[in-house]
């Protein structure tokens, strides 16, 4: 049995490791078409694992940390609006996934994130940042979300299915 401090340290360590992995998966293994809002990456996966292991607070902090650190690797300053959108995504994953794993939860969670975070929240940020038209931004963000949605569900569901038992033993 772990003490409360040991439990918090374990969850913090898992979240920090997942934030670092998210930076690698997003900034170094991801693809972002120059001059467009298209982005294909699997940086969400470590955050979803942190959400399963530690819950909404830790996954939100991990996603925000990964976004801020990752922005420096991309050569620009962090955007607080994008970082807050990532925090919201982390919270949603933490609420849906904390110690719970099912396909319906993955579908619902990633669908909410796709519609509300990726399209409705991030689109105005891209319009403001890059002076893109609303139509172009919403269209491309919607296409991006529709392409990423099944990929994210599939990757998350089967990855967690593969690591769930050892992860549960660790926790």
Task: Give the ranges of each region predicted by the language model.
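Loop-helix junctions at membrane interfaces
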Residues: 1-171
């Amino acid at each position: 049995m772990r003490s409360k401090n040991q439990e918090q340290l374990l969850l913090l360590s898992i979240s920090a490791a997942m934030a670092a992995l998210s930076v690698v998966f997003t900034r170094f293994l991801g693809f972002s078409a120059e001059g467009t809002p298209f982005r294909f990456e699997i940086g969400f996966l470590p955050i979803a694992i942190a959400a399963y292991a530690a819950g909404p607070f830790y996954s939100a902090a991990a996603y925000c940390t990964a976004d801020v650190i990752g922005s420096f690797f991309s050569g620009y300053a962090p955007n607080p609006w994008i970082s807050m959108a990532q925090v919201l995504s982390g919270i949603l994953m933490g609420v849906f996934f904390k110690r719970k794993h099912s396909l319906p939860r993955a579908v619902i969670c990633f669908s909410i994130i796709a519609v509300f975070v990726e399209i409705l929240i991030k689109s105005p940020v891209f319009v403001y940042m890059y002076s893109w038209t609303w139509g172009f931004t919403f269209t491309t963000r919607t296409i991006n979300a529709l392409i990423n949605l099944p990929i994210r569900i599939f990757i998350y569901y089967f990855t967690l299915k593969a690591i769930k038992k050892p992860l549960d033993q660790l926790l």
